[in-house]
UniProtKB/Swiss-Prot annotation:
The keyword Cytoplasm applies. An aminoacyl-tRNA editing enzyme that deacylates mischarged D-aminoacyl-tRNAs. Also deacylates mischarged glycyl-tRNA(Ala), protecting cells against glycine mischarging by AlaRS. Acts via tRNA-based rather than protein-based catalysis; rejects L-amino acids rather than detecting D-amino acids in the active site. By recycling D-aminoacyl-tRNA to D-amino acids and free tRNA molecules, this enzyme counteracts the toxicity associated with the formation of D-aminoacyl-tRNA entities in vivo and helps enforce protein L-homochirality. Its EC number is 3.1.1.96. CDD domains: Dtyr_deacylase. It comes from Listeria monocytogenes serovar 1/2a (strain ATCC BAA-679 / EGD-e). The lineage of its organism: Bacteria, Bacillati, Bacillota, Bacilli, Bacillales. This is D-aminoacyl-tRNA deacylase. It comes from the Bacteria. Keywords: Cytoplasm, Hydrolase, RNA-binding, tRNA-binding. One of its GO terms (molecular function) is D-tyrosyl-tRNA(Tyr) deacylase activity.
Length: 150
């Protein structure tokens, strides 16, 4: 499981020029799954994300988590996080989980974030969307469950 996390002032998802989800501040998460991901992977990543200390304290050090600070989450499915560009000019997405599995894991991930007490807005799984993010910092962090569990 990969999550591209961005601390944001605001973020929104639109389809056909209509905003379908938006948050005023917190985290925007672009979320991708691979074949080996499980519900346990999802649980681990959800807990990791809500506990990450990526907001500044009064000393301007990243020392405050979203759980401590408050804020919302915009979660957007993003199978292209598993793009393989090692050969040729066209990306391959064979490392991405099949749609049915990825959608179930994505729904579970969003449920875990909501159970942790956050407002969770989402995109539409598998749809073409326009995502607007006003990144704060900018702070952008790539989380990879395989790398984190080594």
């Amino acid at each position: 499981m990969r999550v591209l996390l961005q601390r944001c002032y605001e973020a929104s998802v639109s389809m056909e020029d209509e905003v379908i989800s938006e948050i005023a501040g917190g985290l925007c998460l672009l979320v991708g799954f691979t074949h080996t991901d499980t519900p346990e992977t999802v649980d681990y990543m959800a807990k990791k994300i809500v506990g990450l200390r990526i907001f500044e304290d009064e000393s301007e050090k990243m020392n405050i988590s979203l759980a401590e600070r408050g804020g919302a989450i915009l979660s957007v499915s993003q199978f292209t996080l598993y793009a393989d560009v090692s050969r040729g000019k066209r990306p391959s997405f064979t490392k991405s989980a099949p749609g049915e599995k990825a959608e179930a894991l994505y729904d579970l991930f969003n449920q875990k974030l909501a159970e942790a007490g956050f407002i969770v807005e989402t995109g539409v799984f598998g749809a073409m969307m326009d995502v607007k993010i006003v990144n704060h910092g900018p702070v952008t962090i790539m989380l990879d469950s395989e790398e984190m569990r080594k």
